[in-house]
Amino acid sequence: ARRWVTDLSGDRVGVPYVKPGDEGFVRTDIRFSHEYVTPMAAIFWRDFVGAAEKVVDPGSIFFFRDHLTFLELAMTDARKAEGLLDVALELKKKQEEFAEEQGITLYGELPRTARNSIVQGSEAICHSKMLERHVLPGQVVIGSDSHTPHSGAVGCVAFGVGNADAM
């Protein structure tokens, strides 16, 4: 396994192989982010890359709204009165806007219905959906979720990153 990782990593960095202590940027196959991190990454993108710039290969990027989906049901009235729900809903809005601007797939919330106006759930849980539908053996995958290495079950290299690294 170590040989496979060093060979794969070398290929992604642009050298025959890597050894302990080497540094470089790794070319990924898939990137994904959830609603806590996407808005921060969008702000970094706008401020440091440029609002008019487009991400490279938006088809390989996926956004998820799965951590705060039921917040309006779970949050106490006292916390709502403090404005915390409004702040959380801004994260949702920012994520939706950035996905739209960049042409990135967003797994959002299930639609509300006329009969039931409350949140019905999320379209997907990020680390599960990636494993079920998107990742393939031999790929390099990064995600903003702590369960990102879950995708390694199919023989890919998958690891979690922070918001600045996600884009």
Describe the residue ranges of each PLM region.
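Fe-S-dependent hydro-lyases/dehydratases of central metabolism
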Residues: 1-167
